[in-house]
Protein backbone atom coordinates (compact mmCIF):
# COMPACT_ATOMS: atom_id res chain seq x y z
CA UNK A 1 0.00 0.00 0.00
CA UNK A 2 2.79 2.42 0.91
CA UNK A 3 4.54 1.73 -2.40
CA UNK A 4 1.61 1.93 -4.81
CA UNK A 5 -1.25 3.96 -3.31
CA UNK A 6 0.49 7.36 -2.97
CA UNK A 7 1.45 7.29 -6.66
CA UNK A 8 -2.03 6.14 -7.73
CA UNK A 9 -3.80 8.75 -5.62
CA UNK A 10 -1.46 11.47 -6.90
CA UNK A 11 -2.14 10.43 -10.49
CA UNK A 12 1.52 9.93 -11.37
CA UNK A 13 0.77 6.21 -11.79
CA UNK A 14 -2.47 4.78 -13.22
CA UNK A 15 -4.13 1.38 -12.94
CA UNK A 16 -6.07 -1.19 -14.94
CA UNK A 17 -8.34 -4.16 -14.28
CA UNK A 18 -7.19 -7.19 -16.31
CA UNK A 19 -9.97 -9.76 -16.22
CA UNK A 20 -11.24 -10.48 -19.73
CA UNK A 21 -9.51 -12.93 -22.09
CA UNK A 22 -10.30 -13.87 -25.71
CA UNK A 23 -12.34 -16.90 -24.63
CA UNK A 24 -14.12 -15.41 -21.60
CA UNK A 25 -15.53 -12.21 -20.20
CA UNK A 26 -18.52 -12.79 -17.95
CA UNK A 27 -17.52 -16.40 -17.15
CA UNK A 28 -14.18 -15.79 -15.44
CA UNK A 29 -13.98 -19.44 -14.44
CA UNK A 30 -12.46 -19.95 -17.91
CA UNK A 31 -9.43 -17.70 -17.23
CA UNK A 32 -6.23 -19.29 -18.62
CA UNK A 33 -3.56 -16.72 -17.68
CA UNK A 34 -0.87 -18.53 -15.66
CA UNK A 35 1.08 -17.50 -12.56
CA UNK A 36 4.21 -19.58 -11.92
CA UNK A 37 5.97 -19.09 -8.55
CA UNK A 38 9.49 -17.62 -8.65
CA UNK A 39 12.22 -18.36 -6.11
CA UNK A 40 12.11 -14.79 -4.76
CA UNK A 41 8.42 -14.97 -3.84
CA UNK A 42 7.18 -13.19 -6.97
CA UNK A 43 5.27 -14.86 -9.81
CA UNK A 44 5.81 -15.17 -13.56
CA UNK A 45 2.57 -14.08 -15.25
CA UNK A 46 1.88 -15.40 -18.77
CA UNK A 47 -1.22 -14.91 -20.89
CA UNK A 48 -3.32 -12.46 -22.88
CA UNK A 49 -5.94 -10.03 -21.61
CA UNK A 50 -8.31 -8.06 -23.84
CA UNK A 51 -10.61 -5.03 -23.55
CA UNK A 52 -8.26 -3.35 -21.06
CA UNK A 53 -9.20 0.32 -20.64
CA UNK A 54 -6.11 2.58 -20.65
CA UNK A 55 -3.99 -0.56 -20.93
CA UNK A 56 -1.16 1.29 -22.67
CA UNK A 57 -0.39 5.02 -22.85
CA UNK A 58 2.23 7.60 -21.90
CA UNK A 59 0.04 9.83 -19.72
CA UNK A 60 1.51 8.51 -16.45
CA UNK A 61 4.96 7.36 -15.36
CA UNK A 62 3.78 3.83 -14.65
CA UNK A 63 0.72 1.62 -15.22
CA UNK A 64 -0.22 -0.83 -12.48
CA UNK A 65 -2.11 -3.82 -13.86
CA UNK A 66 -4.35 -5.80 -11.51
CA UNK A 67 -4.44 -9.26 -13.09
CA UNK A 68 -6.50 -12.41 -12.55
CA UNK A 69 -4.41 -15.56 -13.10
CA UNK A 70 -4.13 -19.21 -12.06
CA UNK A 71 -1.45 -20.88 -9.96
CA UNK A 72 -0.19 -24.30 -11.17
CA UNK A 73 -2.12 -26.25 -8.52
CA UNK A 74 -5.25 -24.08 -8.58
CA UNK A 75 -8.70 -25.69 -8.50
CA UNK A 76 -10.79 -25.44 -11.65
CA UNK A 77 -13.29 -22.66 -12.16
CA UNK A 78 -13.69 -19.46 -10.19
CA UNK A 79 -12.36 -21.08 -6.99
CA UNK A 80 -8.88 -21.28 -8.52
CA UNK A 81 -8.27 -17.65 -9.48
CA UNK A 82 -5.70 -15.46 -7.73
CA UNK A 83 -5.07 -11.72 -7.96
CA UNK A 84 -1.73 -10.12 -8.83
CA UNK A 85 -0.15 -6.70 -9.18
CA UNK A 86 1.82 -6.55 -12.43
CA UNK A 87 3.42 -3.11 -12.96
CA UNK A 88 4.48 -1.87 -16.38
CA UNK A 89 7.75 -0.78 -14.75
CA UNK A 90 8.95 -2.70 -11.71
CA UNK A 91 9.35 -0.18 -8.86
CA UNK A 92 12.95 0.50 -7.84
CA UNK A 93 14.20 0.11 -4.27
CA UNK A 94 13.63 3.81 -3.62
CA UNK A 95 10.04 3.60 -4.88
CA UNK A 96 10.82 5.16 -8.24
CA UNK A 97 10.69 3.70 -11.75
CA UNK A 98 12.76 0.55 -12.31
CA UNK A 99 13.20 -1.88 -15.18
CA UNK A 100 10.54 -2.56 -17.82
CA UNK A 101 8.31 -5.54 -17.10
CA UNK A 102 7.54 -7.79 -20.11
CA UNK A 103 3.96 -6.54 -20.51
CA UNK A 104 3.30 -5.43 -24.08
CA UNK A 105 0.36 -3.97 -25.97
CA UNK A 106 -0.59 -6.27 -28.84
CA UNK A 107 -3.06 -3.82 -30.35
CA UNK A 108 -5.54 -1.03 -29.66
CA UNK A 109 -9.18 -1.85 -30.41
CA UNK A 110 -11.07 0.19 -33.02
CA UNK A 111 -14.40 0.79 -31.36
CA UNK A 112 -17.89 2.06 -32.13
CA UNK A 113 -17.67 4.64 -29.34
CA UNK A 114 -15.59 5.91 -26.38
CA UNK A 115 -12.74 6.33 -28.84
CA UNK A 116 -10.76 8.60 -26.50
CA UNK A 117 -10.26 5.56 -24.25
CA UNK A 118 -7.37 3.36 -25.35
CA UNK A 119 -8.80 -0.17 -25.16
CA UNK A 120 -5.81 -2.50 -25.32
CA UNK A 121 -4.87 -6.12 -25.88
CA UNK A 122 -2.14 -6.88 -23.33
CA UNK A 123 0.35 -9.74 -23.57
CA UNK A 124 2.10 -10.91 -20.40
CA UNK A 125 5.32 -12.81 -21.19
CA UNK A 126 6.59 -14.13 -17.84
CA UNK A 127 5.99 -10.68 -16.37
CA UNK A 128 6.83 -10.19 -12.70
CA UNK A 129 3.71 -10.26 -10.56
CA UNK A 130 3.02 -9.85 -6.86
CA UNK A 131 0.22 -11.77 -5.14
CA UNK A 132 -2.56 -9.67 -3.58
CA UNK A 133 -4.36 -11.33 -0.70
CA UNK A 134 -4.80 -15.09 -0.42
CA UNK A 135 -4.14 -17.65 -3.12
CA UNK A 136 -7.25 -18.71 -5.06
CA UNK A 137 -9.30 -15.89 -3.51
CA UNK A 138 -8.66 -13.34 -6.24
CA UNK A 139 -12.15 -13.12 -7.67
CA UNK A 140 -13.63 -12.11 -4.32
CA UNK A 141 -11.06 -9.32 -4.02
CA UNK A 142 -11.60 -8.20 -7.60
CA UNK A 143 -15.34 -7.82 -7.03
CA UNK A 144 -14.61 -4.91 -4.69
CA UNK A 145 -13.20 -3.17 -7.79
CA UNK A 146 -16.07 -4.29 -9.98
CA UNK A 147 -18.87 -3.14 -7.66
CA UNK A 148 -17.31 0.32 -7.49
CA UNK A 149 -16.88 0.32 -11.27
CA UNK A 150 -20.55 -0.61 -11.72
CA UNK A 151 -21.58 2.42 -9.68
CA UNK A 152 -19.29 4.53 -11.86
CA UNK A 153 -20.85 3.07 -15.01
CA UNK A 154 -24.30 3.98 -13.69
CA UNK A 155 -23.04 7.55 -13.30
CA UNK A 156 -21.76 7.34 -16.87
CA UNK A 157 -25.29 6.44 -17.96
CA UNK A 158 -26.61 9.48 -16.10
CA UNK A 159 -24.02 11.68 -17.80
CA UNK A 160 -25.15 10.50 -21.23
CA UNK A 161 -28.79 11.19 -20.36
CA UNK A 162 -28.02 14.69 -19.14
CA UNK A 163 -25.78 15.45 -22.11
CA UNK A 164 -28.45 14.30 -24.55
CA UNK A 165 -31.04 16.50 -22.82
CA UNK A 166 -28.79 19.56 -22.58
CA UNK A 167 -28.09 19.35 -26.31
CA UNK A 168 -31.66 18.55 -27.34
CA UNK A 169 -33.34 21.37 -25.42
CA UNK A 170 -31.69 24.40 -27.10
CA UNK A 171 -31.97 22.73 -30.51
CA UNK A 172 -35.72 22.21 -29.99
CA UNK A 173 -36.11 25.86 -29.01
CA UNK A 174 -34.30 27.14 -32.11
CA UNK A 175 -35.38 24.70 -34.83
CA UNK A 176 -38.64 25.70 -36.52
CA UNK A 177 -41.05 23.48 -38.41
CA UNK A 178 -44.71 24.03 -39.37
CA UNK A 179 -47.43 25.10 -36.93
CA UNK A 180 -48.53 22.96 -34.02
CA UNK A 181 -51.82 21.08 -34.25
CA UNK A 182 -53.10 22.91 -31.19
CA UNK A 183 -52.65 26.27 -32.88
CA UNK A 184 -49.95 28.78 -33.74
CA UNK A 185 -47.52 29.38 -30.88
CA UNK A 186 -45.16 31.95 -32.43
CA UNK A 187 -47.15 34.07 -34.92
CA UNK A 188 -44.24 36.44 -35.54
CA UNK A 189 -42.03 33.61 -36.79
CA UNK A 190 -42.13 31.72 -40.07
CA UNK A 191 -42.95 28.53 -38.14
CA UNK A 192 -43.23 27.34 -34.55
CA UNK A 193 -40.20 25.99 -32.70
CA UNK A 194 -40.34 22.20 -32.60
CA UNK A 195 -40.41 22.24 -28.79
CA UNK A 196 -44.10 23.15 -29.12
CA UNK A 197 -44.86 19.94 -31.03
CA UNK A 198 -46.29 17.30 -28.69
CA UNK A 199 -44.01 14.45 -29.72
CA UNK A 200 -40.85 16.54 -29.32
CA UNK A 201 -42.05 17.82 -25.95
CA UNK A 202 -42.72 14.23 -24.87
CA UNK A 203 -39.17 13.17 -25.75
CA UNK A 204 -37.65 16.18 -24.00
CA UNK A 205 -39.70 15.54 -20.86
CA UNK A 206 -38.67 11.88 -20.95
CA UNK A 207 -34.99 12.88 -21.10
CA UNK A 208 -35.48 15.37 -18.28
CA UNK A 209 -37.37 12.91 -16.06
CA UNK A 210 -34.82 10.14 -16.57
CA UNK A 211 -31.91 12.50 -15.95
CA UNK A 212 -33.33 14.01 -12.77
CA UNK A 213 -34.56 10.65 -11.50
CA UNK A 214 -31.18 9.10 -12.28
CA UNK A 215 -29.43 11.82 -10.32
CA UNK A 216 -31.67 11.03 -7.36
CA UNK A 217 -30.68 7.37 -7.62
CA UNK A 218 -26.99 8.32 -7.58
CA UNK A 219 -27.55 10.46 -4.46
CA UNK A 220 -29.33 7.51 -2.84
CA UNK A 221 -26.36 5.21 -3.55
CA UNK A 222 -23.96 7.88 -2.30
CA UNK A 223 -25.87 8.04 0.98
CA UNK A 224 -25.35 4.30 1.44
CA UNK A 225 -21.65 4.69 0.69
CA UNK A 226 -21.37 7.56 3.18
CA UNK A 227 -23.05 5.44 5.85
CA UNK A 228 -20.58 2.62 5.14
CA UNK A 229 -17.64 5.01 5.43
CA UNK A 230 -18.97 6.45 8.68
CA UNK A 231 -19.40 2.96 10.17
CA UNK A 232 -15.89 1.98 9.06
CA UNK A 233 -14.41 5.06 10.72
CA UNK A 234 -16.27 4.20 13.95
CA UNK A 235 -15.25 0.55 13.79
CA UNK A 236 -18.89 -0.59 13.80
CA UNK A 237 -18.78 -3.82 11.76
CA UNK A 238 -22.49 -4.58 12.11
CA UNK A 239 -23.51 -1.16 10.84
CA UNK A 240 -20.93 -1.34 8.04
CA UNK A 241 -22.28 -4.67 6.76
CA UNK A 242 -25.85 -3.39 7.03
CA UNK A 243 -25.15 -0.51 4.63
CA UNK A 244 -22.82 -2.63 2.49
CA UNK A 245 -25.67 -5.09 1.91
CA UNK A 246 -28.02 -2.25 0.97
CA UNK A 247 -25.53 -0.79 -1.49
CA UNK A 248 -24.78 -4.23 -2.91
CA UNK A 249 -28.49 -4.79 -3.54
CA UNK A 250 -28.90 -1.35 -5.10
CA UNK A 251 -25.82 -1.47 -7.36
CA UNK A 252 -27.10 -3.80 -10.14
CA UNK A 253 -30.42 -1.91 -10.18
CA UNK A 254 -28.66 1.41 -10.62
CA UNK A 255 -26.15 0.15 -13.17
CA UNK A 256 -28.65 -1.73 -15.31
CA UNK A 257 -31.43 0.86 -15.19
CA UNK A 258 -29.42 4.03 -15.81
CA UNK A 259 -27.33 2.60 -18.64
CA UNK A 260 -30.35 1.25 -20.52
CA UNK A 261 -32.13 4.59 -20.13
CA UNK A 262 -29.06 6.44 -21.39
CA UNK A 263 -29.47 4.71 -24.75
CA UNK A 264 -33.14 5.71 -24.84
CA UNK A 265 -32.27 9.34 -24.07
CA UNK A 266 -29.65 9.38 -26.82
CA UNK A 267 -32.19 7.86 -29.20
CA UNK A 268 -34.68 10.59 -28.33
CA UNK A 269 -31.97 13.19 -28.91
CA UNK A 270 -31.32 11.87 -32.41
CA UNK A 271 -35.06 11.95 -33.14
CA UNK A 272 -35.34 15.55 -31.94
CA UNK A 273 -32.43 16.55 -34.17
CA UNK A 274 -33.97 14.74 -37.12
CA UNK A 275 -31.52 14.25 -39.98
CA UNK A 276 -28.94 16.38 -38.21
CA UNK A 277 -28.88 13.80 -35.42
CA UNK A 278 -27.32 11.36 -37.86
CA UNK A 279 -24.53 13.75 -38.84
CA UNK A 280 -21.27 13.69 -36.89
CA UNK A 281 -20.78 17.45 -36.77
CA UNK A 282 -23.85 17.90 -34.55
CA UNK A 283 -22.56 15.55 -31.84
CA UNK A 284 -25.73 13.66 -30.99
CA UNK A 285 -24.68 10.50 -32.81
CA UNK A 286 -21.54 10.38 -30.65
CA UNK A 287 -23.66 10.30 -27.50
CA UNK A 288 -25.58 7.37 -28.98
CA UNK A 289 -22.33 5.55 -29.83
CA UNK A 290 -20.68 6.28 -26.50
CA UNK A 291 -23.73 5.31 -24.42
CA UNK A 292 -24.01 1.87 -25.99
CA UNK A 293 -20.99 0.37 -24.22
CA UNK A 294 -22.37 1.20 -20.77
CA UNK A 295 -24.88 -1.67 -21.02
CA UNK A 296 -22.06 -4.09 -21.86
CA UNK A 297 -18.97 -3.48 -19.78
CA UNK A 298 -18.75 -4.03 -16.02
CA UNK A 299 -21.40 -6.71 -16.52
CA UNK A 300 -24.12 -6.67 -19.16
CA UNK A 301 -27.67 -5.72 -18.22
CA UNK A 302 -28.60 -9.40 -18.15
CA UNK A 303 -25.71 -10.12 -15.80
CA UNK A 304 -26.92 -7.31 -13.51
CA UNK A 305 -30.31 -9.04 -13.41
CA UNK A 306 -28.71 -12.37 -12.51
CA UNK A 307 -26.58 -10.69 -9.84
CA UNK A 308 -29.61 -8.93 -8.36
CA UNK A 309 -32.00 -11.86 -8.24
CA UNK A 310 -29.62 -14.80 -7.99
CA UNK A 311 -26.85 -13.52 -5.72
CA UNK A 312 -28.24 -10.53 -3.82
CA UNK A 313 -31.89 -11.55 -3.30
CA UNK A 314 -32.03 -15.36 -3.24
CA UNK A 315 -28.55 -16.69 -2.43
CA UNK A 316 -27.20 -14.13 0.02
CA UNK A 317 -30.29 -13.00 1.91
CA UNK A 318 -33.21 -15.29 1.02
CA UNK A 319 -35.19 -12.17 0.14
CA UNK A 320 -34.31 -10.21 3.28
CA UNK A 321 -32.68 -7.35 1.34
CA UNK A 322 -35.93 -6.73 -0.54
CA UNK A 323 -37.99 -6.77 2.65
CA UNK A 324 -35.53 -4.41 4.35
CA UNK A 325 -35.45 -2.08 1.37
CA UNK A 326 -39.22 -1.80 1.09
CA UNK A 327 -39.89 -1.66 4.84
Predicted regions and their residues:
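Glycine- and acidic
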Residues: 1, 16-18, 46-52, 62, ...
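Internal maturation/activation junctions in enzymes
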Residues: 1-37, 222-244, 251, 262-266
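Structured core elements
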Residues: 16-19, 32-36, 44-46, 51-52, ...
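Short Gly/Pro-enriched turn/cap motifs at secondary-structure boundaries
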Residues: 23-26, 56-58, 75, 111-117
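A short core secondary-structure module
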Residues: 42, 46-100
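A glycine-rich, basic-preceded beta-loop-alpha segment at the flavin cofactor/substrate interface
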Residues: 51, 90-106, 111, 118-149, ...
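Alpha-helix capping/hinge segments and adjacent helical runs
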Residues: 114, 220, 241-326
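Extended amphipathic alpha-helical segments enriched in small hydrophobics
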Residues: 150-231, 318-327
